[in-house]
Amino acid sequence: LKFAAATIGGLSRRANNEPLDSMVYLITAALGYAALENAFFLFGPLQAGDIATSVVAGNFRFLGSTLVHVLSSATIGIFLAYAFCRPRTLKILSVTTGLLLATLLHTLYNILILNTDISFFAIFGGIWAGIVLVLVFFELVKRLNPYCR
């Protein structure tokens, strides 16, 4: 869903004219999706009048959920950025690889928070390590030649 939103919102447009753009469009789509998902998550307790649960659960949810969506979408964006000036076949392979890795990251996050006794803070630390890697790749992608030859 996030990839479709990013494709409609920017990836398929003429404005997507340099490698960094794919990361920006996908991260933007992830933030929008996470905001919508978090809002829906909060409506249940709020409708039941349980404001305290909504605030406490919402804080943890916003931290983990938003960052894991950014991490998984940025992963796809990184693969797209490195395939920017490559042939169409390589772009398709790159998107597929990025989607599979992003799905794996999100699935691992879901398994860890739902089915293990690992503390939220340990899981959150792993997500932050991934976000730091995204920032490193962001800087590396900025150095790529934006013009295809």
Which sequence ranges carry the predicted segments?
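Hydrophobic alpha-helical segments at protein termini of multi-pass membrane proteins
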Residues: 1-149
